[in-house]
Structures are given as C-alpha cells and as structure tokens.
Amino acid sequence: AFVLTLLVPIQMVGQTWDDHDRSGRYTCRDFGQNYLKTLPEEGNPIIFTHGDNDTFPLWYNLDTEGFRTDTRVCNLSYLQTDWYIDQMKRPAYESPALPISFERKDYQTGTNDYVYVRPENKQVLLKNAKTEAERERVYNSFELNEILNYWIKEYHMIPTDTIWFKLDKDAILRSGMFIPYEYRGATDEETKALMPDRMYISLANKNILMKNEIMMLSLIAGCNWERPLYMSVTVPSEMYLNLGGHFIQEGLAYRITPFNYKKLGYNARDGEGTVVDTEKMYKNLMTFNFGGLDADNLYLDETIRRMCYSHRRIYIQLAGEFIKQNDYNRAKVVLDKIEKEMPASTLPHDIICYSTEMAKMYYMLEDE
C-alpha cells in the first residue's frame, strides 16, 4: 500500500512536470516592464489597465523590482470602489497623488456609483433661458469642470451628451505628444493658432456613466495634458469613454490626446480610430525585453501565449506603418527583432497575431 501511495505523486510529477516548469522564463516580469517602458520618463504618467495580466506584472515591477516607480498604474475595474480611489489620491513611491477633484463623500460606496446622462434636459434648460446671457450660462455649464463639480456632485446627472473644455495649448506643446500635421506651424505661436480651442467628449449612446468613468473625466480635467494619461492596449474598447478617436499608440499603450485623429481622417489600425506615433513606438519597442523566449524547449501556457501574441502583433503593426512611409529599412529591423526575440520554434505563427501580414511584409521587403 505504501508503494502504491508513493507511485501516485511520482506519476503526477512525471506526467505534468513539463507543463508546470517555468524555469528560465521571465516573460511576466519583462512584459510588465514593456508596458511601463511605453510610458514617457517625464511627467509621472498614468496608465489605465483593466484585467489581471495587464495589471499585476506592472505592480510587481513597481513594488518588487523598483522599476519605473515614477509611474502610476490605475486599474479601471477597481476604480469603481471608494477604497481604491482613496489609494489613487495618495502618493506612491515617486508618483504624486492622482488629481481627482472629488472628496470622499462624493465617491463613497452608494454615492455617484453611476449618474444618468439625460441630453433631453439640455433643450429644457435652453428653452427656459430667457436671454442670450442665460443661454450662454447654460452652454457654459456643460464645460467639463462644471459637469464634475456642479451637475454630478449636486444633481447626480449630466444634462447633455456633449462635454467640452478649453485646451491649454502651452501644456499640450510641452507634453511632447504627437501634434497632427494639420496643426503644425513654423513656430509654437503658429501651432497654437492652428489648434482647436476646445476638446469635445461625446457621451452619445450612453445612458449612464459609471463611477470609474466619472473618475476618468476628473483625471482628464486634473492632468490637463501636463501629466500624461495612457490606456493599455488590452483594455476593452467599451471602456474607452468614446475617446478611441483621440488615442495615439506609442507601444503597449495609447496616449490620450485632445485631438480627434479619426475626424481628421488619419488612417486607423482598426475601427477604434487609433493611429501610431511611429517615432516613439519604434524607440520604445526596440528596448523591449522578452524574458528568455528565444530559449529552446521553453514551456508557454495559454495565458503567456496570449501575451506573446499581443507583443508580436504590435511589432507587425509598426512594420506596416513604416512600409506605408516607404521606410523599408526600419520595417525590416522591427520584423527581425520580433522574429529573433520570439522565434517560431518557441511561439508558432498564427493568424490571430498577424503572421500572414508578417509573411507578406517579408516577401515585399525582399523586392525593395
């Protein structure tokens, strides 16, 4: 009986060791660093995340490795809770507190868990305005800070589906974000003159705003383009707050900008309207590490494979952008890097990670 009992764990170890052996694999650590490497080194940037795999590796690097402790990871799932908002309003390492304008009484459990979006009330307000000055006051009440500090805090509702706020053009220029070509002048003053004066946030087709979305609006107002805001590429599009057209990709994250690239007609990677800052993305991707994926006989479970495919996909995407610009040399450099770091012997090619496009690019580059 003793021998039979001993054989059971031996059998289990013998049959399952290979698919539990993580020796030599540091992908989670490095992938977490790759997200943080996407963020600029100035301005104490904030990155919105959503799930476990785009959050916990980042937290590990902040808390254990001490890597990029100037940044802040803000999980949108947790941002629904008062205790997590409390954390975000406190400094952490070299990261200052997040500029959320709400006091605890305005976001404690049971308060502003959600607010209604009632655009029909806009017409009622305008109809009741007797003079031009009163109508002007109504329109001014739809400014972002007025929405946050008056309508939400006092009435727990939003009487419009279009919010606006005035742009700090000097802060935008200092931020280092990609300025659309349409707004670029010969001097900073010319550029500012070409920029729009306001940013508009559409709440169309939204009946309610959840607490995390309210906090996102508060952060957009509080950061004022001086503290960069990013959205992880793994966040579902339904959590974009209709800002997808304002995203520009710089790696494993989209920078949130005041410019609607989609309306400007910029070529989108997908239906969300995201475009690529090729210079920043190239600089970032060439510094990424891959946790030993080029080693032989490395076991990759389903979760790691999915994270690997996300990485391979953005390299192929960047190479495609360079090909559009006729920059064939850098397109090949990008493809060669990901193929070297993530060889097919470790991670087989698959249609879900644009491998067909990768093959077409290599074929085309051979002719250039």
Question: Where do the model's predicted regions map?
Answer:
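ER/secretory pathway lumenal C-terminal domains and tails of membrane proteins involved
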Residues: A1-N44, F56-E368
